[in-house]
Amino acid sequence: MITMQNVRKKYKDFELELSLEIPEGRITGFVGKNGAGKSTAIKLILGLVKPDAGKLCVLGNEGGELPAAVKQKIGVSLTESGFSSQFTVEDVWHILAKMYPDFQKDFFDKKCDVLKLPRKKKLKEFSTGMKAKLRVLTAISHKADLLILDEPTAGLDVEARNEILDLLREYIAQDEKRTILITSHISTDLESLCDDIYLIHDGKIILHEDTDVILEQYGILKVNEEQYRTLDKTAVIKVQKETYGYACFTNDRRFYQENYPQIAVEQGGIDELILMMTGGYR
């Protein structure tokens, strides 16, 4: 579905160099600190910027620029994109109907009712949650094979976030070949939705792992100086010096639970993954 092999994009003060593969039928999370390169990677995938080097393939199309037929198969929701604030949902409906031959008019209408999106109200009067729901709805309403979503639930309350996540689960359940690439700073959303996670830092992928593996096997060891000195560090990925001693990030917390019962072992989630992998040493 998406393949990037040594894809490079260089700017004056930043350079991106990525290799990743997102097969069909997967929901993949793309995480990292602000400025890590997520937005640049998305622009490359969408053909908004051209790579300086490397091989990029999206939906079978190789090269930076996407032909119209491929664009028809992609649904996009970006944080800084959207329709004119003077438009209404009815205006959006007519625009989508003209843009996409596969626009699902009845589906769009039904979901507007479910999501409580008024048809005649101008978008400038919409709440943040309503705008976010409309962005995602427009992305999934034309039978896209690939969804690319940049922070779709940012700044939303729990109810609005869950409505959007339910939309995405319904979308993926309708066709097992559909694929989603999603960025988010809300780790619980990713942990409940994604099959796997790519972590990007300073323009490079530094970790790729299945979400279940992260939640079931990763963890943080809290050790003092003496415990750290005698610790078997074979399964320690990163170490962070702290006031009391060390925090050690591991991809095999069960090993330490079984062999070092005196050590405090905490479960590692996506937040811990980002914090430890983009800091510490080793």
Model-inferred region functions:
Residues 1-19, 24-26, 67:
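A short, flexible loop at the N-terminus of ABC-type nucleotide-binding domains that lies
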Residues 32-37:
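Walker A (P-loop) phosphate-binding loop of ABC-type ATPase nucleotide-binding domains
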Residues 46:
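Helix-to-loop junction immediately C-terminal to a conserved catalytic motif
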Residues 54-65, 69-70:
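Conserved ABC transporter NBD signature motif
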Residues 72, 78-135:
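ABC-family P-loop ATPase nucleotide-binding domains
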Residues 147-151, 156:
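Catalytic Walker B motif of ABC-type/P-loop ATPase nucleotide-binding domains
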Residues 165-181, 185-250:
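ABC transporter nucleotide-binding domain
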Residues 236-282:
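C-terminal coupling/interaction segments
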